[in-house]
Amino acid sequence: MRSILILLSLLLTIAFASASFPYQCGPYSCQFGQVCRIDNGVCNCIPINDCHEVSLSTKVVGTWVDGSRGNKRFTQYDITITNNLNTNIKQIYIATDYTLRLRDHSNTSIWNVNLLPNGILTLPSYQPSINAHASFTFGFILEGTQPANLNVLSVSF
């Protein structure tokens, strides 16, 4: 009985650890400045500049001062993910940093994208893929006028 409990505990630990890393290559498999590229389940690390399969573009929608929030300046951005492949992108993970200073942590400050607790952005459940040669747009409102630093961390197709 004791060995069964130990085995169950071990299996639960493995399951939890596996679920903690949402991308197949793992969070630390590629070096800084590289993209984890997953093609038919095969993981490769390539330099960001060599990742032509997908691109991110940032557009300023508008900037304003909000008197109800202490006269702080806010900027709304649209981010477009473009699939340059002849095949669908199954999943994409986008890294952020301290520059992703959301107005607040509500659904009115970020939309059409999932923000994971570790700051990584992923496709929402209602957008399971990005079709070949198509694009998908998400947006957010940031405090200030500095755009967020966004980098493709992992792409699966």
Swiss-Prot record:
Upregulation: By the stalk-specific morphogen DIF (Differentiation inducing factor).
Signal peptide positions on this chain: 1-19
SMART domains associated with the record: CBM49 (SM01063)
GO molecular function, one term: extracellular matrix structural constituent
Main location: secreted
GO BP field: cell differentiation; extracellular matrix organization; sporulation resulting in formation of a cellular spore
Cellular component per GO, a single term: extracellular matrix
Alphabetically ordered keywords of this record: Developmental protein, Differentiation, Secreted, Signal, Sporulation
Pfam (any one): CBM49
Gene3D superfamilies (UniProt xref): 2.60.40.290
Location of this chain's protein in the cell: Secreted
PANTHER family: CARBOHYDRATE BINDING DOMAIN-CONTAINING PROTEIN-RELATED, CELLULOSE-BINDING DOMAIN-CONTAINING PROTEIN-RELATED
The protein's name in its UniProt record: Stalk-specific protein A
Species whose genome carries this gene: Dictyostelium discoideum (Social amoeba)
